[in-house]
Amino acid sequence: MNRTISALKEWLNPDWARHRSVPPFEAGLRPNRRLDEGTTLLPEAQFEPDDVVIRDTGEVVFSSGDGIFTLTDGVVTRVVTLGGQVGSLLVAEDRMIAAVEGVGLVTIDADGVATDLCTDAELAACVTDLTLLPDGIVLATIGSRAVPDWSAALVADDRSGRIVRVDGSHAEVVAEGLGWPGGIENAGAGEVLVSLGFDHRVERRAVTALGKAGAAVGSNLPVYPGRIATCTDGWWVAAPYARNRFTELLLDEPDLLREMTATIRQDQWFVPRLRCPDPYTDTLQLGQLRVHGVIKPWTPPRSYGLVFRIDQRGRIAESVHSRADSDRHGITGVASRDGRIVVAARGFRNLLEPQKDNER
């Protein structure tokens, strides 16, 4: 009914039409080349890091495939192999907590011994992020309960995402009906930051009222925000995907969307990706402009590399980019300690330490 009314209003007066728009990268999100000029930390194409954390000792720990690895002085060591794809990581004192697809939450002690923490069905799939509260409670975001694949959930406008409270082996759903909550982080004062990917929004919610909509910290972002990590002067937010006008147009047309999903294989859908290995064969090339075979950095990206920092006042203070003409894309995790930043570029299949100069 709403769709019919909208179509009728647009027919009567085109100026009444309301369509999705993509805001520009500006102010704190002004494009730069800090990821492109940063340092790669892993051997090329040997890993596909999903998340990363930095311990108090400065040791870098990351997840890739079914394992957890450490990186010390350029040497990568496998810590443990788990029973499924390892995603989000969390440091909790002298142990680690990992989300394992098909299993749930697993703890890994200092000796690398893994023990099941919570194997509740709510945590068995699509855990996107974890955070630890001061009282020892773990909060987990579930991207989707019904459609655990990101691109399929996007075109379905899925709203089955949840926040789950984990106390030992007990799990309790404390928020539901969310549009792909991709990140959560303790913000102090009894609050957490939550990123809502399909709403292009980061918001602050009270721990005692996680089921209620919170105050926007960043809204109508030009990206789909993901995992969040605390730093000394705010929070870093990973943005695995950037929005583009082609996809937004598609999402405004349900009939066209249904035809696409029914007639085109999923890897060719006109939606953002973590990486775009051969952009020259992309259908319609998403409107990208090429001169002499060169992709321009300002073109509509199918894949993009970005993390941005929100300061204590809730403003986007800085960001690091890898633009459309590069390949250091698909940033799924970020960690910061003592001024050092390390990002997990799953699309690029490496860990990156961004260039420090924000003017580049």
Name each region found by the language model.
Residues 62-63, 98-99, 139-141, 193-195, ...:
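Residue position within the beta-strands of beta-propeller blades
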Residues 45-55, 83-95, 122-137, 145-146, ...:
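Beta-rich, blade/repeat-based domains predominating
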Residues 37-44, 74-81, 113-120, 170-175, ...:
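A short beta-strand motif characteristic of beta-propeller blades
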